[in-house]
Regions:
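Short, charged, intrinsically disordered terminal tails
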Residues: 83-96
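Conserved binding/recognition cores within well-folded domains
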Residues: 1-73
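DNA major-groove recognition helices of helix-turn-helix
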Residues: 33, 80-81
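C-terminal structural segments of small proteins and small subunits
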Residues: 72-75, 79-80
Length: 96
């Protein structure tokens, strides 16, 4: 679980992106996986993305950066995302 950077939905499949660069694809919905993961470590940032908040590196232009990739942060998910980050005392730097 700690090696998961983020998960991207693709219909009824999900792509699990790991810290070692591997990507796993499995037949499961993002919602089903979200229910199985600890809510204080994983947060929905967009209808198609679930991120490991411990791996967030920064924010720029409404997107967060994880593992060198820019992940969308939708308006409807911002409040929950920042709430979880505030409880974890995560300090984000602006990306240029």
């Amino acid at each position: 679980m700690d090696d998961i950077l983020f998960v991207k939905a693709d219909g009824d499949y999900i792509h699990i992106h790991k810290a070692d660069g591997d990507t796993l694809m499995t037949l499961m919905t993002l919602k089903a996986l979200e229910r199985q993961l600890p809510f204080d470590h994983f947060c929905r940032t967009h209808r198609s993305y679930l991120v490991n908040v411990d791996k967030v590196e920064g924010l720029k232009d409404g997107k967060n950066r994880i593992g060198g990739k820019r992940i969308p942060l939708s308006d409807s998910c911002k409040a929950t995302f920042f709430e979880i980050l505030s409880h974890k005392s995560v300090v984000l730097k602006a990306q240029s």
